């Protein structure tokens, strides 16, 4: 049985023959018999210091899925130094940092300022596949810091207060310092959280539209509904703005994985014969791709597929995880 003939799009050189014409169509079409290869999008979250950056940058370089280069968005201050990245992985990264702007008129002191939402959207919507030939992956480190900065920016600018209230001086927001100075600090109010959450969801939406694999690093937080029980209703996940957004943020991503340090006791053989064995406590780096307790995780798999990486204990290099992930068929199209 032959595949159905798809309608053809119009092109700048003129309409194609043999099918309907959609002038400047804002949609694409593909034959279901030969779908495009699936791109990986994942949020990796966990407490600070568990090795998330080393994990997301230890990719199987040079493979068809991951490419030989990755765009590494060093949003966390200091992450551009790549100290948390294994030396052998650093040459494969193209480091991108948010750019500060100089503010200050003639005769005024010049200061460095940044609009975090604007800068993040510039990065999220850039054509990285064209800017970095050979790159098939974008890594954002980290999403939590971006969310915190957006919330502060929304509060400091008073974006959620109506212009009429500002003119009348009816704004009830608590603030510290001069509003015209970069040092000004305002205490966020409830509408600020709503605005910042909306901004994060929009950033996340555009980021996932990149024609690349997308990996985002976050720290962890949890949401317990008022009146809910600790066991059944509390949801742990990646931290962004507030806690009510956690389930909503996670649902948009195909993969949400949690990293943690788990303490284990191992037996150590004696150095000399006849001496008793000893026991030593060690920290193991563990990645979970399925829910454990309140901590939510998920992994995309083909229909009927089995998750062989529900719990993964890291060796000296996280590249082994990614190779097993690719070999297992997880993350591929249905």
PLM regions and their residue ranges:
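Conserved P-loop
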Residues: 32-140, 144-149
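N-terminal pre-Walker A segment at the start of P-loop NTPase domains
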Residues: 2-33
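A generic local structural motif
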Residues: 28-31, 51-53, 201-202, 243-244
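Short regulatory "switch" loops immediately downstream of catalytic or recognition motifs
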Residues: 58-62, 96-102, 152-155, 221-224, ...
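Phosphate-binding/switch region of NTP-binding enzymes
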Residues: 206, 212-312
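Glycine-rich, flexible loop segments associated with nucleotide phosphate handling
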Residues: 112-116, 134-137, 186-191, 244, ...
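NTP-binding/hydrolysis catalytic cores, primarily Walker-type P-loop NTPases
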Residues: 297-334
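P-loop NTPase motor core
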Residues: 137-248
